[in-house]
Amino acid sequence: EEGEAPGASLTIAQEALTSLVNAIEPGLALTVLAQLLQAPLQRVAGWQGRYGIFIQGRTGSLKTSFCQTLMCLYGPRFAEPDLLLKWGEGATRNAIMSMAARAHDLPLLIDNYKPNTGGGGRDFVALIHNILEGGEKDRLNASSELRQAKSIHCFPLMTGEDVPDQDAASVARVLVLAFPWQPGTPNETLAHAQERSQHLQALGSAWIDWLEDTANAGVIKEIAGQLWQRQRAWATELTGYKTGMANALRVAANLASNELAFQVALHCPALAAVLLPVAAHHA
């Protein structure tokens, strides 16, 4: 992926991921991790319907630092500030759509949504809709020929202080997680992970290798096949919690696939070493 870190250590990567999970509330951290792991799993599992995660938190909730470090599962350069994709700061909707197409089966971090930048909430909701509906629009090139639109398979991970809520259908495509504010307090656990972020790609590589190993196809298929059953269970729970909830089935599908992606990850030995001791927090 984005650059290489020679000598990445799986053991150090596991230590770093353990710190990341514990740097924020483990239940929140594991939900984000499951989405990042689901991105390359999605097509292997035969699932349809991607979703985004929006991490809401005040300045000082460490949401960006956490996400950048976790993204290092797919390459150490995701920790570099210059590569951070910021909403409204040089990243137009068209530019982000182009990057989403290039991200293929990976997560895409879009940082720092603010309602008063980059076209505001309306543009942001349209962007979410376009990314998760699966592609760019067909356009004509300079020769008036139809240019082939690129399909999109990435999973957007977004951060911001305010959640855009202009469109119920688009919001239903996004799991919103509120990160607790950490008012100026040094987070030594997160710092421990950041100092070892260049090793995290060893875990990402182990995950990709495990997914590509045909010996694991059976367990992936077995867990993936529980999607509809888990979606119905989540829908029942959601409608019981909030009667008449709009788009309950869509939200339930997001929760079900996140849950099952985590269950698949527990079968990957490199990840299981980190995840099994904290698995009860992912609910």
Residue ranges and their predicted role:
Residues 124-141, 146:
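Conserved catalytic/switch belt of AAA+ P-loop NTPases
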Residues 1-83, 255:
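P-loop NTPase catalytic core of nucleic-acid-dependent motor ATPases
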Residues 65-121:
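AAA+/P-loop NTPase substrate/partner-engagement loops
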Residues 107-131, 161-172:
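Conserved AAA+/SF3 P-loop NTPase catalytic/coupling segment centered on the Walker-B
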